[in-house]
Amino acid sequence: WQRIVELGDAGTMHELVSGEVFKFIRGLGGSSMQEHMRGATFGISSPATLKLVMDKLDKIDLKSKDLAGDLYEYMLSKLTTSGANGQFRTPSHIIDLMVALMEPTFKDRIIDPACGTAGFLVGAAEWAKGAGQGSGKAFMTKANHERYETEMFHGFDFDATMVRIAAMHMFMHGIDEPNIAYRDSLLPLPDP
């Protein structure tokens, strides 16, 4: 990141990020992110816009996964695609209420059949990891931590872009292998 920012020249930065870095991210082998990023395109076409965004992000301490996740959530709230295809983002206070009523634990499997940006799954993950589990003590066991990262949360959406956004949202909140799949949850399940 720092080396790209230090390049200074907007054209060089854009060429490197759109050509090499994005290509690398799309090809991360052995991870679910590779599947989610298949067919993704780099959406910042202007070198000047990329430089502006990178300069602004560089001023923020993104080493904290919580801060990075919060920033990502803020950017999600500004999505212009909200309402397209009948999709609407659930307000965070509604997510918080639903999660508090549910009180998820590490014994649960949480499935969101229309996950959109994965706001509900992230809320449930944060609850299980922290506030709802005695301030994170249960999260510290190896078994709980592994279950949290690999099999506790599942989301489905019928919009490929939302699947990518949801997977990245989960990743930004510490779920290294997000179980987010492209699927219309109203259709019958395929035969096994």
Language-model regions, residue ranges each:
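Conserved S-adenosyl-L-methionine
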Residues: 84-192
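Non-catalytic, mostly N-terminal accessory regions of nucleic-acid modification and defense proteins
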Residues: 1-106, 179-188
